[in-house]
Amino acid sequence: MQILLANPRGFCAGVDRAISIVENALAIYGAPIYVRHEVVHNRYVVDSLRQRGAIFIEQISEVPDGAILIFSAHGVSQAVRNEAKSRDLTVFDATCPLVTKVHMEVARASRRGEEAILIGHAGHPEVEGTMGQYSNPEGGMYLVESPEDVWTLNVKNEGKLSFMTQTTLSVDDTSDVIDALRKRFPKIVGPRKDDICYATTNRQEAVRALAEQADVVLVVGSKNSSNSNRLAELAQRMGRTAFLIDDAADIQEAWVKEAACVGVTAGASAPDILVQNVIARLREFGGGEAVTLEGREENIVFEVPKELRVDVREVE
């Protein structure tokens, strides 16, 4: 059995930054550190940080006065931000800069009195945070997930309308929704560059290349990870059997027993150690040496806040 690895895969710059913010805060201030929502959607990462003293909460009211609070990589609404400001808290923002970019687009539309449409998945924390940047009562903020949602949507003024997208969507599905928006609202204005982030796009391109060669595709990522789910869906659309797994223990030998080639990739919030564990598991089932496919090189780095720029090894 051949083992192929997608390239790129795993951590993106936004996830790296968010995890570093929590790790550095723990090193500098000591436990406990409070984090609103899972800092990234990966069970292994969250459990590891929890063991080191991070406490994950959903409501600001759960945080005691004088504590350190970190916003997750998915971002928060202005209401949550204002609630935190009203408290005696030290706040660090781990919102991915590419999510912040979308926040700024929504805030700009709100200031201008334009209505705004967000393409995204209802209930996802990134969507909740992005929708929460709009505050103009004279306008309106709407969420659509599919072309069907677009055709049933009514707005107040089609002449002052813009759209944005969640950063972790399917590139193909989002293109279909944008096409529907432009047909339904010919004057709608979109971002100069697609809001779907570079890492999401690159990993979808990589899994497409992987699925062209593999019989079975394993996507390492947690069930609540939007970008990981999109990778599994894309492989399935290409006619491959695909499984979303948290770790190597999830793999059933029956999944790969008849496969000549198994492809492995990882969502943007999944650490490489999980991929290495999957490779080891597949080798137990008769797999050969893992081969990494050629892919797009990623060199993007997002800096942590200056107050947290410290060599953790020196602190420890």
From Swiss-Prot:
UniProt cross-references to InterPro entries, sorted A to Z: LytB/IspH (IPR003451)
Signal peptide: none
Molecular-function annotations in GO: 4 iron, 4 sulfur cluster binding; 4-hydroxy-3-methylbut-2-enyl diphosphate reductase activity; metal ion binding
GO terms, biological process: dimethylallyl diphosphate biosynthetic process; isopentenyl diphosphate biosynthetic process, methylerythritol 4-phosphate pathway; terpenoid biosynthetic process
Amino-acid positions noted as binding [4Fe-4S] cluster in the UniProt annotation, renumbered to this chain: C12, C96, C197
Residue positions binding isopentenyl diphosphate: H41, H74, H124, S225, S226, N227, S269
UniProt keyword Iron-sulfur present: yes
Domain of life: Bacteria
The protein's Enzyme Commission number: 1.17.7.4
Pathway(s) annotated for this protein in UniProt: Isoprenoid biosynthesis; dimethylallyl diphosphate biosynthesis; dimethylallyl diphosphate from (2E)-4-hydroxy-3-methylbutenyl diphosphate: step 1/1; Isoprenoid biosynthesis; isopentenyl diphosphate biosynthesis via DXP pathway; isopentenyl diphosphate from 1-deoxy-D-xylulose 5-phosphate: step 6/6
Protein residues bound to dimethylallyl diphosphate: H41, H74, H124, S225, S226, N227, S269
CDD domains found in the cross-reference section: lytB_ispH
Catalytic reaction annotation: isopentenyl diphosphate + 2 oxidized [2Fe-2S]-[ferredoxin] + H2O = (2E)-4-hydroxy-3-methylbut-2-enyl diphosphate + 2 reduced [2Fe-2S]-[ferredoxin] + 2 H(+); dimethylallyl diphosphate + 2 oxidized [2Fe-2S]-[ferredoxin] + H2O = (2E)-4-hydroxy-3-methylbut-2-enyl diphosphate + 2 reduced [2Fe-2S]-[ferredoxin] + 2 H(+)
Entry keyword Iron: yes
Active-site residues per Swiss-Prot or TrEMBL entry: E126
Residues given in the record as (2E)-4-hydroxy-3-methylbut-2-enyl diphosphate binding sites: H41, H74, H124, T167, S225, S226, N227, S269
Cofactor(s) the record lists: [4Fe-4S] cluster
PANTHER family: 4-HYDROXY-3-METHYLBUT-2-ENYL DIPHOSPHATE REDUCTASE
Role noted for this protein: Catalyzes the conversion of 1-hydroxy-2-methyl-2-(E)-butenyl 4-diphosphate (HMBPP) into a mixture of isopentenyl diphosphate (IPP) and dimethylallyl diphosphate (DMAPP). Acts in the terminal step of the DOXP/MEP pathway for isoprenoid precursor biosynthesis.
Name of the featured protein: 4-hydroxy-3-methylbut-2-enyl diphosphate reductase
Species: Salmonella paratyphi C (strain RKS4594)
